[in-house]
Amino acid sequence: MAVGCGTADDTKDSSSSSKGKSDYLVGFANNSDTYNYCAKFRSYLKDATEAKGISITVTDAGGDTNVQNGQIDDFIVQNANVVSAISNDLDGSIPALEAAKDAGLPYVSFLTSVSGGDDYDGYIYVGSPNEDAGKAQGEYLCDAFPDGASILYFTGAPNDQQYVDRKKGLEEALKKNPNIKILDEYNVENSKDLGMSTAEDSLLSYDKIDAIVCQNDDGALGVVEALKSAGKLDSIQVLGIDGSDDALQSIQDGEMTMTALQDAKAQAEAGADIFEK
């Protein structure tokens, strides 16, 4: 079922290109290139922006909010016309938004929100409703386990609005079946490795787990590896969000159960359209 962000050292990982609009510059600070969705989005955004003849500089924050804020400050110093990001943190990214506002520049936030953004006319959010992705997971669980189930919930970054919204959507959908219980919640930080190790520990802690629900596909793919090693892939369902190529292949192979699509290509193309305006 399909319904669905960056690592850096002290130096910027950046690339830029120009095809005719050499005086117009877009800066994009990626959340983390190690997160499958973000890596894919970065590529789509760069291609879609360059296709319009717009110069774009792309950096990788490596999941570090302070690094990302610094990168956006750098874009402003470089006289960028637009700054944009898959913002790392709902509150932690406020300094970057304020810097853009002080410079009179548009701030385009992809996939994730920034607190106070709606109070700035130059703030633009591009992304699908994350609450809907969580809702899709919850609705699937209600259909798959009409008599109830015991599930674990593996989350992403705790103060990232996309994950707050995904949890809200899941919880709302699960109200339809109060017999589906969330045994516990663990932060696996969008990491396949952490998803795997957390699942391994959980298998030792709980006698009965019907499903492990993850807020992104990377964590879910780690869970799949843990269940395969333990011989429990047939008895525990695994749900993700993003619709990554690896997740779709895992579903096709009969491993992951479902994912909710985040359409990176469509969102990137929408961003390029905004840059052009």
Segments (PLM) and residue ranges:
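A residue-level marker of the well-folded mature domains of exported/periplasmic proteins
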Residues: V3-K277
